[in-house]
């Protein structure tokens, strides 16, 4: 696993051995080694965090200190299926995090909805429809080594970014905020995809009401059951 991180340039020295750098580089250098994550787990992918806390992978050596309050976190790791009822809560947690903040989407269910999105009308098909995602971590579930690799990639991204550009990009590409209201739109998934071309609309809709009830009254209940 390649864990080499390009740290910001802090080695520009003068004749008096004074280090000179930019405020953006200094901020990135301090943040990439002290990420405080908020763990948002809803299903089996979240169990992999138990392995990360152990001595084998040593979650703390990257400066990661799990927090229970979004106001103290700058990274949120989403793991598991997100339903429509949970969507406002997830967005609210993200909105309460201070800037700059980052998101790691962990597992197939978080990224695409997974197997639960096949026939379910209440599953969010990708957490990036709610909040902006910085690192995608596929798997079902991802191994602890993959989680460490995702954190390493996020640290590389932080070391190269400019804070002003990130804020501007988030404002222009905003996904959803709690101040907005849900709008009832056209359904993109009806659940009838398995029927395909064999699906036919009920023929009774074309029969006049009077004709239908006259036929129903002339046929016994036993014949209707058969």
Curated annotation (Swiss-Prot):
The lineage of its organism: Eukaryota, Viridiplantae, Streptophyta, Embryophyta, Tracheophyta. The gene is ndhK. It catalyses: a plastoquinone + NADH + (n+1) H(+)(in) = a plastoquinol + NAD(+) + n H(+)(out); a plastoquinone + NADPH + (n+1) H(+)(in) = a plastoquinol + NADP(+) + n H(+)(out). NDH is composed of at least 16 different subunits, 5 of which are encoded in the nucleus. Keywords: 4Fe-4S, Chloroplast, Iron, Iron-sulfur, Membrane, Metal-binding, NAD, NADP, Plastid, Plastoquinone, Quinone, Thylakoid, Translocase, Transport. One of its GO terms (biological process) is aerobic respiration. It comes from the Eukaryota. Its main location: plastid. This is NAD(P)H-quinone oxidoreductase subunit K, chloroplastic.
